[in-house]
Each structure stands twice: as structure tokens, then as C-alpha cells.
């Protein structure tokens, strides 16, 4: 049985990862959160393995957490939301996005643990799409640059999954899906904004079923679904969730940050389900 520590379980990804591993008897999953207020979002039975008051930017707090849990695997789900002001503040973005992953990797190496770190397609500008792991980052904003610096490309005990996510948040509506479902009347659907990420529940499944069983995997891998326009994505979500809303096609935003994940498929055998199936899964696990 692998002991898994999820950092940041109140975030959109962390909550899905904790839930996925918690439902599998083959893993003993622990999680961290900054405030005890977040405990109410989790079932009573799982709270004994949730550690509140953990500040991941405090070295002593991290060391104490690792010493208590003694994990085999650490999954870093701590991160900033690009749409919020903090993502533009160097004093906030750099410690969390750029420095924390490297500090975690060093601590994990000392405790003989494997680190799974999550990065983003925002390390790319979106000018061309179909990006490979070998493509150079050309992000022009602080968020994208800081996430790139935080990637772990060549450490034997760490794997970086570069991807993008959609899903449901625990306590807010900053995400695309929650924002869309909260709207009334009509919204714009960008027909030339291309996305290739995964629902959080599917990315959590990828980690559990395709990354953990391959301890030899390290370095950088793209994990992606088939590219889809945001217009078509919103249309599928509206249909699956029974949302009555007008989605107006808009070609003004042209951006393609889609990732090529053939290397990950060759290494693990993983191939993402179709988008209708992915949206169905997201709805079923909300």
C-alpha cells in the first residue's frame, strides 16, 4: 500500500486528487490545508488524515509534515489561479510557482519519496499549438514564466505533468466551469481558443492508474486530451449539465496552447477518453 500525501486539498485539483485516492483501498492518502475551516468540505471519516495549518512556504512546516506522514509519494497541488491578482505579484507567484517545487523535490529526495508536480500549458504563448516537451517555453507573463521555472525536468525522484485542468472548486466560482454554470442569458464561446486539458477527476485517475504504477518515470511529460475549441467545450458542458444558455460564437480570441501527449501515451499506455465522455465523468464526480 502506497502512502500518498496531497498538498493543497482545498484547491480545485487537490480536492479531486484526495477524493480519488481516498476511494481506493490500495492507497493511504493524507492531505494538507492551510486553514481548519476547509475541513468541513470533507467527510468526517477522512478528516483524521487531513493536516490543517500547514504553510507550504514555511520550511519547518513542510519538514514536520513529511516527518509525520512519511509518504511514499507527494503530489503537489498547491498553486495560484492565473485569473486572480496574486498571479501577477512576484512576491506571491515566485515562492509558490517557481521555488516551492524545487524545495519539495529536495525534501522528498532526503526522505526517499517520489514527487509528482503539476505544471501548465500556460508556459506557452499559444501561438502555434501542438506543443511538445522539447518546445521552448515562450510565455510572456509572470504566471507562465514562474510555472516554467518551477518545473522539474531532470530529477530521478520527480515527475512534472504539464497539462491544463477544468473542474469544480470547493468554495468559489473562479474556474471556467463554475463560472459558466453561474451565468444567465448568454455568454461568448471562443471558436479559436483551443484547449487540450483534462477534468480534475480524470487527471487524478491518470496519476493513480498510470503514474504511480510507473515509478521509473521522471522528468517532464505532457498529459492532454484531443484539442477542442472553448466554444465546443462549453456546448458540451451545457448539454451534459442541462444548462439553458445561449453561447454566442466569437472568433476574436485566437490562442492554441494544446499539448501533444504522445510521449506520455507511449510510456504509460494512457489515451484520454473522448470529450463527451470526459464531460460526463466531470459531471458524475462533481
Model region roles, listed by residue range:
Residues 53-96:
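NAD(P)H-binding glycine-rich loop region in Rossmannoid oxidoreductase-like domains
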Residues 2-24:
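N-terminal Rossmann NAD(P)H-binding glycine-rich loop of SDR-like oxidoreductase domains
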Residues 57, 88, 92-103, 134-137, ...:
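Glycine-rich NAD(P)-binding loop of the Rossmann-fold in SDR/ketoreductase-type enzymes
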Residues 245-286:
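C-terminal amphipathic/interface module of NAD(P)-dependent oxidoreductases
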Residues 31-41, 55-56, 79:
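N-terminal Rossmann-fold cofactor-binding loop
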Residues 102-138:
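Conserved Rossmann-fold NAD(P)-dependent oxidoreductase catalytic core, especially the SDR/UDP-sugar
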Residues 140, 152-195, 201-202, 209:
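NAD(P)-dependent short-chain dehydrogenase/reductase
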Residues 206-209, 213-261:
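Mid/C-terminal beta-alpha module of Rossmann-like enzyme folds, strongest
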